[in-house]
């Protein structure tokens, strides 16, 4: 492979961002969110806006099926580009984030604060293992000032040189697998260029429900990828009280499921029937989501969800370019001289790899609720066909994740007419 030969040696800047790896100095107590500074709160709002523009850009790519991105992690990557860039290269990174009025250091520091708060597993009782690494070719050395600033805001280690030949990319894959408990064994299979910087994010996220699913309420069902193609998946079922809205005009349902400690929630949007998600995606904006959520009411809902792990790796380079990040990825125009001290570096790839697990785990549920009148005749939310989902922070409104499930893992079951 050409890329293996090119990456004979590289410098490395690593940021271990997960709370499991390095916890904030003043960790919030369980169930208590840290109060964000004004700049971090502003960037939380900006990252939520980025979530929808990036999702829409990816949804238009015919080669993409399942989508799974963490907008706050992508925003943090943009912050690193603005910190290490100059002139238009830096200003474009901030423009994609709608943070033009903030200084580069403020953007990077604010995003670091936001990400540390959102990934605090002690406060939130979720599993979020997150690692971020910046690789450069062996000919490039990271500037001391850049390393110092990046380290002070993202708990990054100092750069180090790692010699490798054909094992260079394999070492990245091994790190990603270790970071995600083996859920992501290969994140660099689509590497084409290694003469520039590689920014790699690897994540494993597992929400813990505010009210768990019963482990026996799991069985094998069909998930209809299309009307004529069905795969077998494990589905988990439970009935409870959830925020719910049925938009009969647009023929879609939306349900909000609180996660443990209720600091964040999983929001699922699903068409009434099996159809491509294009129609729903055209409706989806930050403003429209707010309208839908404003119409939600607490109702009894019988929910069925696919159980298992969704593993997705994206190279976001071209999608970020479509949003305006054109200079950083251009070998002839990029000015990342605050990273290396000279204009000898460009952003070759932005790998964003995530394993997202839906399981039954969560807090014990109140068994007495099942004798109440309010749980009779529940609304049905049967997620057996493609849907869009978001993990939203209840305090800041920022999105930890946004994605769609179009084709889960599973064997073909049957053709349907």
Swiss-Prot record:
Query: Where is this chain glycosylated?
Result: 120, 125
Chief location category:
endoplasmic reticulum
Query: What are the boundaries of the signal sequence?
Result: 1-18
**A GO MF term:** serine-type endopeptidase inhibitor activity
| Positions bearing N6-acetyllysine | 206, 318
What keywords were assigned to this record? Acetylation, Chaperone, Endoplasmic reticulum, Glycoprotein, Phosphoprotein, Signal
Mention any one GO cellular component term assigned to this protein in its UniProt record.
Answer: extracellular space
The name on file for this protein is Serpin H1
- According to its UniProt entry, this protein's organism is Pongo abelii (Sumatran orangutan)
